[in-house]
């Protein structure tokens, strides 16, 4: 175990961004080399993840980095000599140089192990976080701007974007290094730089660089668990099962402490107080890196806002966006680190963690909000007046009910001549619910405030009472976002949309019939979908081909012949979503590959057009054929970038959420 990883207990940052990795000695062990050739699209379909990561690395870092990453993705953890055995055309020193760059960009993690003979070996692991940062690099820069006030903090926006660009390009950055690159800045500019760093650190987009960023989660868990297990006394009467459970409980506490402290560095707090001005500033000697988990929370919020827009409406989705932006920083992450350790093979552990996360969604400080909180943060150009249906709609229903033809009732007299009055009209249950709903949305039509609390509360009630639980109410007037129950619905809805748009509405109809009925026969599907039997069979064959549904054979008798069996159909969403994820991954990688091929085929023309003496004078210095070809290249590249953005928004739902 290296010094950086040993410093995880207690916390310590990796010195020099992990540059000390290459100085360790590797053993001479080697395995039989197996060439990895993904030149053809057929071979790339065997591992779409490897295809995507290799293309990303090739487009951003070059051919050598792409080759090294491909080996690590396909073969797992390897030492430098083992990597060299798979890539003999690269020298050992070149591989080490590439690994240093990949480690600094968080594309590779490492761990030092000591064998029984005492020999220390550094093993390298592929880390997809660095590739995700490359994949989202453009959107990260644009999304950061949304967290600044465009009117009052425009001077900080450009600085914040430059800081993020430098952090993504270098992997990590200190305030001191950034100020050194801005040596010509005056005192006002330096103050603004400090304020931009403070703002990004407050939002947790920048966090201190720690050993956890370079350590594989699974190996970290194994180290903590073995350490706690070895501490237990061996001469006690406790069973081995109790010892393991005790060690597991202690290791979980230490593991959660390590992975859930992004705002602390190894030497103390990240924030300091400037003795001269009294303002808060970031410690200039602390290495900062980008917090991918925090950014993915904002991507999740954007997906939920678009989902609410399609189901509730545009105005309510804007209210929802403000509520999510208030709470996303303190909300649960997309996945808990313990889910990557293998503990979820135990059903009790999985259930316990899921219950804890559900409680955190409601009880953690900063995750709940009220209508007043949302109203204070609404944009000034948003006018909510006239966006809700008022209670006068219920009056129309009452009038319609009163205008119904009268029902003549028989008059009943008692023995003494008393006439029994008719029974009062009982309102139906549906009408009562409608009146209750109207009462909840009973607003003042003469309200002059376009962003009043009553209007905001009306939209929150729409989100609360919808069939999809966009928000829930923990206390009267206090709401929270139930991510654990909302994300599965988002996945199913996205999957249905893809099926409907690619395979047609008939496939979507059959898929919904099977989902609603569970395990069902072909006759049941034909009856409920109101389709012909021949069409149903064709659609079922297509859905089975794409792993959207599964076939289960149920024998009717002891005879197992196929002719005497009944075939039922069901949906297993885990398998269906995984197939869709692999499909989208391959298409995304293929699109990136085509864009890179387009640039390579027109490299000479692009190089000529990007020369300083040609820019702005293309019509004068380029031939007509070159101008036409340049226009074709630009159009194809723009079209490819739009398609990439759309694919990315679909891919992340199944890959990251």
Swiss-Prot record:
The keyword Coiled coil does not apply. One of its GO terms (biological process) is DNA-templated transcription. GO terms for cellular component: RNA polymerase III complex. The keyword Zinc applies. InterPro entries: POLR3C_WHD, RNA_pol_III_RPC82-rel_HTH, RNA_pol_III_Rpc82_C, RPC3, WH-like_DNA-bd_sf, WH_DNA-bd_sf. Residues 428-448 have a biased composition (Acidic residues). Its main location: nucleus. Keywords: DNA-directed RNA polymerase, Nucleus, Transcription, Zinc. Transmembrane segments: none annotated. It is found in: Nucleus. GO terms for molecular function: single-stranded DNA binding. Residues 584-605 are annotated as: Leucine-zipper. PANTHER family: DNA-DIRECTED RNA POLYMERASE III SUBUNIT RPC3, RNA POLYMERASE III DNA DIRECTED -RELATED. Belongs to the RNA polymerase beta chain family. Component of the RNA polymerase III (Pol III) complex consisting of 17 subunits. This is DNA-directed RNA polymerase III subunit RPC3. It comes from Kluyveromyces lactis (strain ATCC 8585 / CBS 2359 / DSM 70799 / NBRC 1267 / NRRL Y-1140 / WM37). The lineage of its organism: Eukaryota, Fungi, Dikarya, Ascomycota, Saccharomycotina.
């Amino acid at each position: 175990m290296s010094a950086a990883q040993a410093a995880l207990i207690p916390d310590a940052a990796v010195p020099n961004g992990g540059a000390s990795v290459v100085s360790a000695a590797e053993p001479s062990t080697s395995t039989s080399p197996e060439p990895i050739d993904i030149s053809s699209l057929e071979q790339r379909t065997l591992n779409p993840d490897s295809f995507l990561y290799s293309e990303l690395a090739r487009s951003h870092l070059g051919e050598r980095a792409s080759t090294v990453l491909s080996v690590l993705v396909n073969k797992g953890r390897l030492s430098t000599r083992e990597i060299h055995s798979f890539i003999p055309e690269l020298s050992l020193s070149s591989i080490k140089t590439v690994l240093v760059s990949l480690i600094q960009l968080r594309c590779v993690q490492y761990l030092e192990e000591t064998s029984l003979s005492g020999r220390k070996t550094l093993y390298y692991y592929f880390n997809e976080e660095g590739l995700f940062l490359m994949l989202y690099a453009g959107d990260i820069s644009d999304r950061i701007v949304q967290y600044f006030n465009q009117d009052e903090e425009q001077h900080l926006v450009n600085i914040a974007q430059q800081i993020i660009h430098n952090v993504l390009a270098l992997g990590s950055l200190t305030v001191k290094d950034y100020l050194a690159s801005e040596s010509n800045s005056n005192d006002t500019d330096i103050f603004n730089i400090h304020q931009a760093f403070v703002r990004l650190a407050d939002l947790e987009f920048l966090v201190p660089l720690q050993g956890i960023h370079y350590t594989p989660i699974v190996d970290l868990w194994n180290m903590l668990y073995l350490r706690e297990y070895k501490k237990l006394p061996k001469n006690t009467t406790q069973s081995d099962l109790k010892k393991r459970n005790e060690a597991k409980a202690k290791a979980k506490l230490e593991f959660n402490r390590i992975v859930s402290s992004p705002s602390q560095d190894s030497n103390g707090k990240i924030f300091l107080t400037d003795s001269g001005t009294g303002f808060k500033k970031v410690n200039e000697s602390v290495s900062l890196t980008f917090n991918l988990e925090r950014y993915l929370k904002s991507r999740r919020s954007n997906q939920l806002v678009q989902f609410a827009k399609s189901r509730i409406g545009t105005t309510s989705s804007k209210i929802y966006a403000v509520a999510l932006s208030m709470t996303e920083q303190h909300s649960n992450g997309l996945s808990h680190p313990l889910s990557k350790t293998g503990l979820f093979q135990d059903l009790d552990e999985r259930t316990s963690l899921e219950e804890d996360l559900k409680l955190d969604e409601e009880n953690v400080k900063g995750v709940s909000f009220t209508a007043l909180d949302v109203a204070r943060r609404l944009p000034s150009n948003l006018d909510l007046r006239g966006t809700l249906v008022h209670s006068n709609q219920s009056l129309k229903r009452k009038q319609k009910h009163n205008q119904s033809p009268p029902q003549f009732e028989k008059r009943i007299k008692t023995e003494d001549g008393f006439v029994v009055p008719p029974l009062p009209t009982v309102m139906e249950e549906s009408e009562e619910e409608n009146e209750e709903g109207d009462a909840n949305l009973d607003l003042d039509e003469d309200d002059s405030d376009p962003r009043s609390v009553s209007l905001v509360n009306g939209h929150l009630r729409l989100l609360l009472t919808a069939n999809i639980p966009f928000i829930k109410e923990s206390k009267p007037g206090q709401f929270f976002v139930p991510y654990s129950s909302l994300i599965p619905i988002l996945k199913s809805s996205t999957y249905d949309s893809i099926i409907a748009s690619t395979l047609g509405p008939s496939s979507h109809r059959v898929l919904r019939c099977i989902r609603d009925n569970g395990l069902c026969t072909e006759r049941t599907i034909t009856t409920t979908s109101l389709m012909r039997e021949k069409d149903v069979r064709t659609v079922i064959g297509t859905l089975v081909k794409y792993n959207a549904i599964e076939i289960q054979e149920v024998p009717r008798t002891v005879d197992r012949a196929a002719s005497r069996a009944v075939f039922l159909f069901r949906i297993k969403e885990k398998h269906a979503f995984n197939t869709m994820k692999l499909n989208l991954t391959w298409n995304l990688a293929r699109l990136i590959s085509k864009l890179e091929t387009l640039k390579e085929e027109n490299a000479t023309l692009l190089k000529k057009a990007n020369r300083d003496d040609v820019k702005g004078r293309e019509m004068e210095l380029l031939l007509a054929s070159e101008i036409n070809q340049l226009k074709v290249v630009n159009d194809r590249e723009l079209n490819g970038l739009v398609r990439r953005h759309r694919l990315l928004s679909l891919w992340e739902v199944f890959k990251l959420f």
